[in-house]
């Protein structure tokens, strides 16, 4: 019974195209939420004991400590349902009452269709011809990883492409993919050093998380390889400011940074803002014009348009 409920949750999430599933404890029930794109919606409220058992089921499959309900835990697994396998990442923590919450990240390990409202992949690819560092920013589920892989296939076909990810999200037979495992010393820093010995034409680094990672990314870019990576920021100018916060100098950025792409999924499609110079002074004119066009064409509401526009005060 518990396994059937768990499988139905994963089945439903996959059908909806959800990125995350949330089990939220209340006083005497569990609420189930799913996030699709930028929207998080409540699916329903369910029996507390039954859904606590569902959480324990997922934890067991992911190799987590089922008896520990207060301390935070992380886990991952390939979950079987309908003769399919779904890659999951799990995170749990208990509240002050000892009631456990669970977030499941669904990894879409097959490439998703990436539809842009106003851009074409081939046109975007023309921006990535110079060697150096290219950064992709945007919220979770905005298609950053998919876009990086699409560009890798179109620009670097037949060349040496490597990726360093945590975890590997899109499995590719035509590139060498490395996965972090800090328990055995496979950190971003060490894997970047290792990958450079293979002299890749393109190195994809899953995410810039801290100053140590960004230093390694900059060093890799200085070797002459082309490097793709993602970073958390809310605009192109925000990417530049974030790099400075992490300790990269303006002089280094002038040498290695070849382009910044900011993207979001809005109204069922993606929109992109790209810059290859003057990042700190970049104006979101193109971005806001795209938002206005989506509003005019009826794809988003006026409230969504105001929310999605970028302004610098």
Model-derived regions, located:
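Short, flexible helix-loop junctions that flank or precede catalytic/ligand sites
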Residues: 1-313
